[in-house]
Design a protein with these regions (language model features):
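Sec-dependent N-terminal signal peptides
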Residues: 5-14
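C-terminal motif of bacterial Sec signal peptides marking the signal peptidase cleavage site
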Residues: 16-18
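An N-terminally biased module of ancient metal coordination in phosphate/nucleic-acid-related enzymes
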Residues: 22-90, 353
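Active-site gating/metal-coordination segments in enzymes
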Residues: 27-29, 77-198, 202, 249-252, ...
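Hydrophobic faces of well-ordered beta-strands that scaffold small-molecule active sites
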Residues: 37-41, 61-64, 93-97, 127-129, ...
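Acidic-and-aromatic substrate-binding clefts and catalytic sites of carbohydrate-active enzymes
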Residues: 40-48, 67-77, 101-110, 137, ...
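Alpha-helical scaffolding within the catalytic cores
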Residues: 45-50, 73-84, 111-115, 210-215, ...
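H/E-rich (His + Asp/Glu) clusters that bind or coordinate divalent metals
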Residues: 202, 208-216, 221-361
Length: 361
């Protein structure tokens, strides 16, 4: 009897050891084994560290143009992105953009379509629309131009026919309509960019108004693939994001510049969100290189490189680990717990969903 107890106990220990090893394998994975696409980047200029850093993280990137207004500066930024793409076509994907300041022109839509056709001929696979729709640009009557304005509809019809997806940064985090709150993840941005702090400009439409216009636009274009950038400007509450994903099957989201909002929420809630919508969420950072190389600022450049590397690592630890985590993003710091997503979900989030959007497959 005593011998049987010893044998039985040994079996239990062996099973426990096996389970522990399995759990370890699931939570100590190597990021190099996971292909990645940063679905939201602005590398307008090259650096000697850029490709080695992306190699380290097994990463490609979508280079996104941002049309704020019809200016020579905006056009030069697009030329810079095209040059980057031409230099590294196996590393980068290209995303064009347009804005609507000339919406009163009767041939507005035709001119935008002609521009986009030229952009596609130069390699663009997507189109970006920015928060100037709803918050900045007005028509001749002084009315803010919302993204669901009927005068833009011919452009959406054209993109639907061409099967070209759109990435839309519409609106801002809710914080933009509130007084600056120290400790809020967005306080630094609105301190540095007061022109987008809607709280100071009561004439800017309410957050709810802009979100309603965005939702109406998505509903009116059910056959157009729409990626709502920055978690759809609803990153403070994943329940709001989930509500839209349930309602609009043509909508996806990406995480660029909204990681602090995400990690502030309950880790179990976040994990369940990523599991439920594993086919609809993509990785994004909003990292940029906005100026040509200046040898006198090489130290600043290397600081940027180290910051990018650190944040890539933080994102990976949060998603793949299974332990408490100090999420330190410089001006924003918090304690949380990583969410230990399965390999299959990580592969979709980091790569497969993005490739599906970019290739239409």
């Amino acid at each position: 009897m005593f011998n049987k107890i010893i044998v039985f106990g040994s079996v239990i220990l062996l099973l426990a050891s096996s389970c522990h090893q399995t759990a370890q394998q699931e939570t100590t994975r190597s990021q190099e084994d996971f292909k990645k696409i940063d679905f939201h980047a602005h590398y307008r200029h090259d650096r000697e560290y850029l490709l080695p850093l992306l190699d380290k993280w097994n990463m490609q990137a979508l280079l996104i143009d941002v049309a704020k207004e019809d200016t020579a500066r905006n056009r030069s930024q697009w030329e810079a992105l095209k040059a980057q793409y031409s230099k590294y076509p196996d590393r980068f994907f290209l995303c064009a953009s347009f804005e609507s300041s000339n919406i009163d022109d009767p041939s507005f839509a035709d001119k935008i379509i002609a521009k986009l056709e030229n952009d596609f001929a130069n390699g663009a696979r997507m189109v970006k629309v920015w928060k100037v729709h709803g918050m900045v640009t007005r028509d001749g009557s002084g009315k803010f131009i919302q993204i669901d304005d009927p005068r833009i509809q011919p452009v959406w019809d054209f993109l639907t026919e061409k099967k070209v997806p759109v990435i839309a940064h519409i609106g801002e985090p809710l914080q933009a309509w509130l007084p600056l709150q120290e400790g809020n993840p967005h306080a630094g941005y609105y301190r540095d960019h007061p022109e987008y702090h809607a709280y100071n400009f009561p004439e800017i439409p309410a957050w709810e108004t802009i979100m309603a216009a965005r939702d109406n636009w998505i509903a009116k274009n059910p056959n157009l693939t729409i990626v709502a950038a920055h978690m759809g400007s609803m990153s403070h509450d994943l329940d709001l994001v989930a509500e839209r994903l349930d309602k609009y099957p043509n909508m996806l989201v990406e995480t660029a510049a909204r990681w602090p909002d995400i990690v502030l929420q309950d880790p179990e809630k976040v994990r369940n969100f990523f599991l439920k919508y594993q086919d609809r969420v993509m990785y994004g950072t909003d990292f940029e290189i906005d100026t040509p190389f200046d040898p006198s600022k090489k130290e600043d450049d290397m600081g940027r490189r180290d910051n990018m590397d650190k944040r890539f690592g933080l994102h990976w630890e949060y998603l793949s680990g299974n332990d408490s985590l100090f999420f330190d993003r410089g001006s924003f710091k918090t304690h949380t717990h990583s969410i230990n997503l399965p390999d299959s979900v990580l592969r979709k989030f980091y790569y497969e969903n993005a490739m599906g959007v970019l290739t239409g497959e």
